[in-house]
């Protein structure tokens, strides 16, 4: 691990830049009297040090110097395994756990271990049942902030993940990854019985049923069989008359989500929900 770059792009250069600053006790604000393209970046403000790039204030020179490495592009800590570099030692140490396999954060409930404390804290919500993120649009709650953000996009119509090949956009990165297989031709799922390959696991699973038990989920009312339990659940509504999807605009209910989504597109101006 060694500082990179030269001039102001090094740790020594940054220290020199700050230490050249001469400030009397009566000065409220003083610009660094240093040489180089970034000479106005660091200023002394009373007993604090302020970064002129972003306005962040520090109470020590050393903290300001370390912070300025972000603006200067200096990454002091470099991983010898993969070459990735970091501004902060704490980030470097955390990254090294990926290579070492170290997982120091342990769940006291079940013993599962993690390499980051933040991952452990998120995981513990499985045991506590805590769902701190609530959607203001529909009231649905979520354990994880990332899932909450993705859900919120279904209300705004925003789709952050775009395919560079065809421009199609998606709410979820996993959906984009799945879609990309269409362009790459990747078929990672291979049937052990006949050797046929498939792009999607769902299609592969459905195919594998033809070699084994067929359709394991059977309707008790009419005897129709299904590959998946959710397909049987959806079919059962044709017998029970259950309609769990309700359009709040017209108070109309639907037995199937596809019909509900089609109705919702009318109200949302054609945006997929």
Curated annotation (Swiss-Prot):
GO process terms (BP): regulation of transcription by RNA polymerase II
Keyword set, alphabetical order: DNA-binding, Metal-binding, Nucleus, Repeat, Transcription, Transcription regulation, Zinc, Zinc-finger
Pfam family, one: zf-C2H2
Main location as per UniProt: nucleus
InterPro entries: Znf_C2H2-type (IPR050758), Znf_C2H2_sf (IPR036236), Znf_C2H2_type (IPR013087)
Origin superkingdom: Eukaryota
GO CC terms: nucleus
Species, as recorded: Gorilla gorilla gorilla
PANTHER family: RIKEN CDNA 6720489N17 GENE-RELATED, ZNF44 PROTEIN
Its biological purpose: May be involved in transcriptional regulation.
Identification of the protein by name: Zinc finger protein 80
